Amino acid sequence: MQTADSRDLVLDRLWQHARARPSEPALYQKHSDGEWKALTFADYRDLVHRTAAACVAAGMPEGGSIGIFCENRVEWVLAALGAQAAGGLVSGIYMNSTDDQAVYILAHCEATIAVVDGPRQVEHLLPHLSMMPKLSRIVVLTEPDVASSFVSKPGLVVSWQEFLDSGKGHEQTVDERFARLTPDTLASLIYTSGTTGTPKGVMLSHHNLAWTARTGLSTFQVDRQDVMVSYLPL
């Protein structure tokens, strides 16, 4: 079995950077006050680990999945890497997807967790829960007290902070699953737009993602001084 020191997964790179330069900025996000605020590599790694523990707490098994139905934001990346660190995979859903397409993707990838922007997405998902039998958690990013709006579904609809807090006590399970990851482990299902029928899922392994990252860095000669802007939908 490969260890985290001998593998070269995207997650391994994050763990390495968090050890080597913990206080340097890894991500910037523009907040409502107009200020760009940094997330350091150490905090980035810690939040990914907490998210992974929350995925375990929500019942996501190894090989399980989460669906992300929100705009580009730091939590999108945390949810994706967190699920992968816990041995799961991630499927992104475009914000211009129809409700039927979103439900289809969540059902097809057998998502345990759906991460959504706000209550509107929740309201569109709830009537279709029977089509998504493995869905145990809907995490809402923009409403910190969202659970009070959906009291008929206790524990199903939670805020991002509640989701993170739920992972306490599951850290060792994350570490064990993280150690079992290999380059061939499935990391993502990317769905087509569905213009010619139902969306089709394309399987990508951790090796696929790592190779793409390494190739992009070398092709464009990106170094530590460069800042890249995330513009296209994740």
Spans of model-derived segments:
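Flexible, low-complexity linker/hinge segments
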Residues: 1-9, 122, 126, 146, ...
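A short N-terminal helical cap/helix-turn-helix that marks the beginning
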Residues: 5-27, 46
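Conserved pre-ATP/AMP-binding loop-to-beta segment of ANL
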Residues: 22-25, 140, 157-162, 168-191, ...
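Conserved AMP-binding/adenylate-forming core of the ANL superfamily
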Residues: 23, 27-81, 98-103, 159-164, ...
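Conserved AMP-binding A3 loop
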Residues: 38-42, 178-180, 187-211
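Conserved structural elements of the adenylate-forming
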Residues: 47-50, 183, 202-223
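Structural core segment of the AMP-binding/adenylate-forming
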Residues: 58, 85-165
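Conserved AMP-binding loop of ANL adenylate-forming enzymes
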Residues: 68, 208, 219-234
